[in-house]
From Swiss-Prot:
This is Transmembrane protein 170A. GO terms for cellular component: endoplasmic reticulum membrane; nuclear envelope. It comes from the Eukaryota. One of its GO terms (biological process) is endoplasmic reticulum tubular network organization. Residues 66-79, 132-138 are cytoplasmic. It is a multi-pass membrane protein. Keywords: Endoplasmic reticulum, Glycoprotein, Membrane, Nucleus, Transmembrane, Transmembrane helix. The lineage of its organism: Eukaryota, Metazoa, Chordata, Craniata, Vertebrata.
Length: 138
């Protein structure tokens, strides 16, 4: 699988190549922590993108399914999908840089699992705040 895809690895291949998820049972620990600013920033940013899309893609599919007969409502799924991409690109870049900057200034190395925890936690907070804002309008 390593040499079978020439050039077109995609997002999943990039995530797996950074070892952002620890492999259990193969005896390896965090042999390559993220130590430079670009490595930390990229690792945190990828998890921001993946975790945001994991919430927004099912929501967009649900909106498309439930509003498929509505004249203008079916376009809500497109806006949900765009927010799943635009959110991490704008806010995710800044927060990833802030997290990586703090780690770099402190002289710490980031294990890849920390990048996962930071961004999944941030995405969870964004989803909770968004849900509570929608409930307040009902």
């Amino acid at each position: 699988m390593e040499g079978s895809e020439a050039g077109g690895g995609g997002l999943l291949q990039q995530i797996l190549s950074l070892r952002l998820v620890p492999r259990v049972g193969n005896g390896t620990t965090y042999s390559s922590p993220l130590s430079t600013f670009p490595e930390m920033w990229y690792g945190v940013f990828l998890w921001a993108l993946v975790s945001s899309l994991s919430f927004h893609v099912p929501a967009a599919l649900l909106a498309l399914f439930t509003l498929r007969h509505h004249k203008y409502g079916r376009f809500m799924s497109v806006s949900l999908l765009l927010m799943g991409i635009v959110g991490p690109i704008t806010a995710g870049i800044l927060t990833s840089a802030a997290i990586a900057g703090v780690y770099r200034a402190a002289g710490k190395k980031m294990i890849p699992f920390e990048a996962l925890i930071f961004e999944v936690g941030q995405t969870f907070c964004v989803v909770v705040v968004s849900f509570l804002r929608i409930l307040a309008t009902l």
